[in-house]
Each structure stands twice: as C-alpha cells, then as structure tokens.
Amino acid sequence: EQAAVSPALNAGIPAVPQILTKNAEHFIHTARALHEAGYDEINLNLGCPSGTVTAKGKGSGMLRDPGVLAAFLDEIFAAAPCAISVKTRIGYDSVEEWPALLALLSRYPISELTVHPRTRRELYGGSPHKEAFAQALKCAPFPCVYNGDLRTKADCAALTRDYPGTAALMIGRGLV
C-alpha cells in the first residue's frame, strides 16, 4: 500500500494524499507515515456522499454530529505532523447546517478548504448552493476552493468571475 503513495510516482506533480476515516488515531498514524514519505500536506475527506461510506460515519457522514467532528478535529490538529486541508459538503441533511459547520471548521488551522456546496442528502442532484461557497469566501480564515458541477472551461471561467477570491477549482466527476 505504501508503494502506491510514493512521492516518486508523482515527481513534478503537486500531489496531496486524501484520508477517509472517522478514527483520529488512524488519521494521525497515516498522516505521519505520509509525511515521513515526503508529503507536506494531507487532505481530510468530509465530502464523500456514498451510502457505503456515510453508513460507517466517514466522509460526509462525519457531518451528522458536530460534537463528534469537533473532537476528531481537535485530536488530529493537535498531533498533525504537517498541514491539513479539508474537502467538505455544506451539511448532512440541510443547507441550514452550513453556517455552524463553517464556524466549526474556522476554529482550526486548515491549510485550504474545498467546498462542494451540496448536502450529503442531495448527493449530486439539483443545483449547487453557490451562496454557501460565497459565505465561505467571505468568512473563512483560510483559502477556499470550489468543487461541484465544473464540466467545461466556460464553467470554470464563470465561477472564478462570479466568485473572486476563489483560491482554486477542483474538478471531480466533471473530468470523467
């Protein structure tokens, strides 16, 4: 498994390994191993909406209980050997969860926040709640990256035009 994440495989390409877990000890152990292998940043996945992932309380399943999420973040940020970035959805059930979630995330020294502006319940349906991303740009103390429904160059140009201050764009399913 370690050979698969060797930095030598990504020579010349800025790569950030992503960890999908709900166990802080596992995150810290894996982050240390990745840091020792040469990575300076690790990404925490709070965005995966897959039913098989969220049923185990991982990915966007962690957004269901802010208290559990806060305890997890307290532990990993206290022991992090390197920078931690986060990819997240804007809530589990409802867009109304976003202000409190953003406030919670803003308590931590996140190196970069990637926002997919849908809830877990929405999966990939409907339109992204871009106003939630705008709120992150306005309120977050760290750089914010947009993710969701970017399929063309025109989509990317429109997003960066409409939301100045966007640190970067993340293209997921739109690339496929």
Where are these regions (language model features)?
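Flavin-dependent oxidoreductase catalytic cores
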Residues: E1-V176
